[in-house]
Regions:
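Conserved NAD+-utilizing ADP-ribose enzyme module
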Residues: 1, 16-17, 21-133
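A short, exposed loop/beta-hairpin motif centered on an aromatic-Gly-Thr core
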Residues: 2-7
Length: 133
């Protein structure tokens, strides 16, 4: 959703559901656990609090292959199944931005972290373990 980066979530069930998608395709699925600590004032962090016009524009730009942020990390809602359906309809031109935002306003964002700077990864992220699902 936020372009190239190292993606994390603090929601265990969300991570499991995402990994299980690989299992359904006949691939191995692993759940990696990390310790992630950062001081927000030391990093450029772009945060989206809701599925709003700014989030929709940023995701649209990233999905078009354009990198528009120099942030060390982007934080915001992940596109779950219902959100993906709305995005697909919006990108296909089936619904307007206003209609998409009207549908998205009822969704509570499941937060994801997209670390986009190698420096932040090396300074703030520590591997703990892996578990095969």
């Amino acid at each position: 959703d936020f372009g190239k980066g190292f993606y994390l979530t603090s929601i265990y069930n969300q991570a499991v559901r995402y990994a299980e998608r690989f299992k359904r395709r006949g691939r191995d699925a692993w759940l990696n656990t990390y310790h992630f600590v950062y001081q927000p004032e030391e990093w450029k962090v772009l945060t989206f609090e809701a599925y709003d016009a700014a989030w929709l524009e940023f995701v649209s730009t990233c999905r078009a292959g354009n990198d528009v942020s120099d942030s060390d990390m982007v934080v915001g809602g992940i596109a779950n199944d219902r959100v993906i359906l709305t995005l697909d309809r919006y990108f296909a031109g089936e619904i307007s931005q206003e209609e998409a935002l009207g549908l998205l306003r009822f969704e509570k964002p499941n937060i994801q972290y997209c670390i986009r700077s190698e420096r932040m990864i090396t300074q703030c992220l520590n591997y703990i373990d892996s578990k095969e699902l």
